[in-house]
């Protein structure tokens, strides 16, 4: 990724509202967790809270799901359509404290644009 540096994994998880799970969508990087229950890990919490999760140190995040042992920081932005989370954008970094509030703003804009496709 050119505009958000030091990202080791970037992808989408899409919501299955019946089963209350996120399933892996398009991504760039090594194979990740394919199914995440709502409320579990950073992605699942973003769905439940309907808000961005900025995690400078995943090892200090209670309930973090380690899809890759090299991940040290993460940002997850919900994609919301008509007040319903339809998916999330998930970025991981091998560096601690890699993501900034500017990254949050950029990804939240991207999520708003993508939400129009649902």
Model region roles, listed by residue range:
Residues 4, 67-71:
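Short loop/turn motifs at secondary-structure junctions and domain boundaries
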Residues 1-23:
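Helix-loop-beta substructure at the N-terminus of cytosolic sensory domains
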Residues 15-67:
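Regulatory sensory and allosteric helical modules in signal-transduction proteins
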Residues 93-118:
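Juxtadomain coupling helices with adjacent low-complexity linkers
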Residues 9, 76, 88:
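Short hydrophobic/aromatic beta-strand element in the GNAT-like acyltransferase core
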Residues 73-80:
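A short, aliphatic-rich beta-strand micro-motif
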Residues 1-4, 45, 113-117:
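Amphipathic alpha-helical regulatory segments at dimerization interfaces
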Residues 80-93:
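Sensory-domain boundary capping and coupling elements
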């Amino acid at each position: 990724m050119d505009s958000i540096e030091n990202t080791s994994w970037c992808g989408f998880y899409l919501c299955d509202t019946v089963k209350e799970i996120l399933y892996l969508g398009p991504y760039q990087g090594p194979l990740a967790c394919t199914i995440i229950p709502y409320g579990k890990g950073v992605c699942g919490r973003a769905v439940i809270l309907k808000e961005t999760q900025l995690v400078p140190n995943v090892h200090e995040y209670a309930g973090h799901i380690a899809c890759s042992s090299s991940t040290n920081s993460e940002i997850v932005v919900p994609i919301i359509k008509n007040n319903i989370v339809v998916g999330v954008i998930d970025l991981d970094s091998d560096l601690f404290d890699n993501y900034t509030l500017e990254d949050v703003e950029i990804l939240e804009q991207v999520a708003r644009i993508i939400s129009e496709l649902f």
